[in-house]
């Protein structure tokens, strides 16, 4: 952008399963492979395709769109303005705004009219006119998949250029179970939500159905361009390879993790000084 005057990477976030077998394997416990040759548990466990081990594939991905109404024109308008998000499979919903928002919000968040009137939605750029006391304020909200696992934490990922090098920093901004990010490390406490690998059961009383907060960048420099996007993590749950192993009485693979944390990502907001 400094050299050409525009940003060719100003994209919205989308995701998909990249499946070639006419199935929609969005659930880890219902994964049926992607390309036909990995249609059985045996082939998924030890097979490969184009020099990639089948066991390394993620089960799925979904695209989400924040449209004003459920019509074809409204959906395409939302995609053009990049008010979209991506998930690793579950129907988690997430949204991100930047603007003149109050210091704190309830977990149910702010009204849509307030969000749009006092700020800009994900996928857009924001300038100094939206700063409060020379600080950028972001509102982020997420709600769990109603048939999925509870949420563990909300994060903001910040990126900026410094001395010609791209820098990134991850901030935990909202934590589950009444905890809060550490003021120095900006990290939530480690999740205590356990997964029983003998049957893939999880602790249902851990985590939140929704998370929301207004966050202010503690290292904000109003003269420095930056991007921000939100990420939300579910509590840990079994990966599809673990489900295959349990159903076939196989040992767990040591080349992939037994559990994962499903997640969703918002489109970025770009700060332009």
Can you name each region flagged by the protein language model?
Residues 1-273:
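C-terminal functional module detector
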């Amino acid at each position: 952008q400094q050299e050409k005057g525009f940003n060719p990477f100003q994209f919205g976030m989308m995701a998909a399963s990249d499946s070639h077998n006419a199935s929609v394997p969005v659930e880890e416990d219902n994964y049926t492979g992607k390309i036909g040759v990995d249609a059985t548990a045996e082939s998924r466990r030890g097979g490969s395709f184009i020099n990639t081990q089948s066991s390394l594939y993620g089960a799925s991905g979904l695209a989400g769109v924040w449209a004003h109404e459920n019509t074809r024109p409204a959906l395409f308008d939302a995609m053009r303005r990049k008010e979209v998000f991506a998930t690793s499979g579950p129907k988690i919903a997430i949204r991100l705004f930047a603007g003149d928002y109050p210091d704190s919000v309830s977990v149910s968040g702010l009204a849509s009219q307030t969000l749009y009137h006092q700020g800009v939605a994900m996928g857009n750029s924001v300038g100094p006119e939206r700063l409060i006391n020379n600080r950028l304020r972001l509102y982020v909200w997420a709600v769990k998949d109603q048939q999925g696992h509870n949420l563990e934490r909300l994060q903001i990922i910040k990126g900026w250029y410094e001395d010609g090098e791209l820098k990134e920093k991850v901030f935990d901004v909202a934590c589950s179970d009444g905890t809060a990010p550490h003021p120095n490390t900006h990290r939530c406490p480690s999740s205590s939500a356990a997964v029983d690998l003998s049957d893939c059961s999880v602790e249902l009383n851990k985590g939140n159905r929704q998370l929301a907060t207004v966050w202010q960048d503690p290292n904000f420099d109003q003269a420095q361009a930056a991007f921000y996007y939100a990420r939300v993590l579910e509590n840990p749950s079994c990966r599809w390879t673990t489900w295959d192993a349990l159903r076939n009485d196989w040992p767990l693979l040591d080349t992939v993790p037994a559990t994962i944390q499903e997640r969703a990502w918002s489109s970025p907001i770009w700060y332009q000084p």
